[in-house]
A protein has these predicted regions:
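Short basic coil micro-motifs at the edges of alpha-helical modules that engage polyanionic partners
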Residues: 46-47, 54, 79, 105
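A ubiquitous short alpha-helical element
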Residues: 26-28, 53-59, 123-125
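Intrinsic disorder at enzyme termini
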Residues: 1-53
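Alpha-helical interaction segments
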Residues: 33-34, 43-44, 54, 66-67, ...
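Mature N-terminal segment immediately following signal peptide/propeptide cleavage
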Residues: 48-72
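Glycine-rich flavin
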Residues: 63, 68-172
């Protein structure tokens, strides 16, 4: 590992990844993050705290957004339409239902769900909002408050994105 730009280390602070403080209070031997990678803005090295499985899911969602969504999304924004033809492809990620366990849902941890939502939003906010309303609002309401019959009736097709959850609001 070649020495690179370093940051200050105070008394009693630990240094990341085996880097060693030099005599001038700076870290040496720390590689900078790769530009454009998810680590690029990981100033606190939080990426080191997630599992390989979480990294793989984050990468899978990021690749989906980069390959399937961002190349086509702008005209949808201009027409004020949602790209419903992407829903079957989105279903293949098996992320609908986020933290709900069972009924075809992935049962993610809160952290994993946050990573997924972050990657969806990074690619396009409308996709993140869509999955947030569908999974976190509609599906979680059924998962927490529905009867077993309602859960069995609605959650499996919603997890496959065959049925879409929504939110309606009226004002007096």
């Amino acid at each position: 590992m070649k020495p690179t730009q370093s940051s200050a280390v105070g008394p009693g602070q630990t240094v990341p990844n085996g880097a060693s403080p030099s005599g001038n209070g700076k870290l040496s031997g720390v590689e900078p993050p790769v530009l454009g990678g998810p680590e690029h803005s990981d100033y606190y090295l939080l990426d080191n705290l997630i599992t390989d499985e979480q990294r793989a899911l984050r990468k899978k969602v990021r690749e989906f957004m980069d390959q399937e969504v961002t190349p086509i999304i702008n005209p949808y924004w201009e027409r004020a339409e949602f790209p419903f033809e992407l829903v079957p492809k989105l279903a293949q990620l098996n992320i609908a239902g986020f933290q709900i366990a069972g009924h075809g849902c992935p049962g993610m941890s809160n952290l994993t769900a946050g990573l997924v939502i972050l990657e969806l939003a990074r690619g396009d906010l409308s996709m993140s909002t869509f999955m947030g309303v569908h999974s976190a609002l509609a599906m979680t309401s059924i998962g927490l408050l529905g009867s077993e019959e309602q859960k069995e009736r609605f959650l499996p097709p919603m997890a496959r994105l065959e049925k879409i959850g929504a939110f309606g609001l009226t004002e007096p």
